[in-house]
């Protein structure tokens, strides 16, 4: 089966952290005697960031669990982990199955045999600090540049001995700019797929991003400032042509962390899905 690209839906906004955020980096980049769990940082700027793969993986996992709760035949049985670290996901065996699966057609499927891969329809960019957040943290007296250290104790349930540890995290109140691009391949799937994307962002708001979520880390809110639907012919024309439609846009320039309150919520995006679908159906 051939995958036809009919256009793209681009969603941009801000990830606002309500609690400290931990997405782990390599300990090899830290000096001897440093903290136990460092955050992931950009190799050039040293800024912590949220990898697109982390957000995509979280969204996929939540959608799998959502569908599994409704469909007893939906299996989450493909192990992509290594050694004793078992990580199971749902993967359709064929392209035909993947094209009908709400998980695999959006997030991709590797199939079970050569030639059965179904590439993802979604692209999620790495999320970096908003300029005002970077400026604020550069001036803040934190433990490290752009981050803080949280001290925790793990208690041995038998001996009651304490095992102290240090976890680096991005402070609460930090804002990251994010971007999600959805490839429009089948117009019949468009409404369901974008509805699922919006639903998953709301689920994450009541869940967490990164590690240590059960201990309060990674609570976030999503605010949107832009959404555009672009037919494939829009890439041949000047910006603002009849082949693209901006369905959501924040007119106010975001200069500090108070301005995000003027942005749109995920519910606003949900209210625009019918408009996006109609735009692509018009041909």
Where are these regions (language model features)?
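RNA-binding basic/glycine-rich loop and surface signature characteristic of RAMP-family CRISPR effectors
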Residues: 1-283
């Amino acid at each position: 089966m051939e995958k036809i690209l009919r256009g793209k839906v681009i969603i941009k906004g801000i990830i606002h952290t309500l609690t400290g955020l931990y997405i782990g980096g390599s300990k090899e980049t830290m000096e001897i005697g440093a903290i136990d769990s460092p955050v992931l940082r950009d190799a050039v700027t040293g800024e912590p960031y949220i990898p697109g793969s982390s957000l995509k993986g979280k969204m996929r996992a939540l959608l799998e669990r959502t569908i599994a709760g409704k469909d007893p035949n939906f299996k989450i049985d493909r192990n992509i982990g290594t050694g004793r670290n078992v990580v199971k996901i749902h993967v359709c065996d064929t392209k035909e199955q993947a094209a009908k699966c709400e998980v695999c057609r959006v997030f991709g499927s590797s199939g079970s045999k050569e030639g059965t891969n179904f590439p993802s329809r979604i692209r999620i960019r790495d999320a970096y600090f908003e300029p005002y957040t970077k400026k604020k943290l550069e001036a803040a007296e934190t433990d490290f540049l752009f981050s803080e250290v949280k001290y925790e104790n793990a208690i041995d349930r038998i001996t009651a001995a304490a095992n102290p540890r240090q976890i680096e995290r991005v402070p609460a109140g930090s804002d990251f700019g994010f971007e999600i691009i959805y490839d429009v391949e089948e117009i019949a799937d468009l409404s369901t797929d974008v509805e699922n994307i919006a639903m998953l962002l709301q689920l994450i708001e009541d869940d967490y991003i990164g590690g240590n979520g059960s201990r309060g880390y990674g609570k976030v809110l999503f605010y949107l400032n832009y959404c555009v639907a672009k037919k494939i012919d829009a890439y041949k024309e000047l910006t603002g042509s009849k082949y693209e439609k901006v369905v959501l846009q924040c007119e106010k320039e975001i200069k500090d962390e108070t301005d995000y309150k003027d942005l749109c919520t995920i519910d606003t995006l949900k209210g625009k899905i019918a408009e996006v679908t109609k735009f692509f159906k018009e041909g």
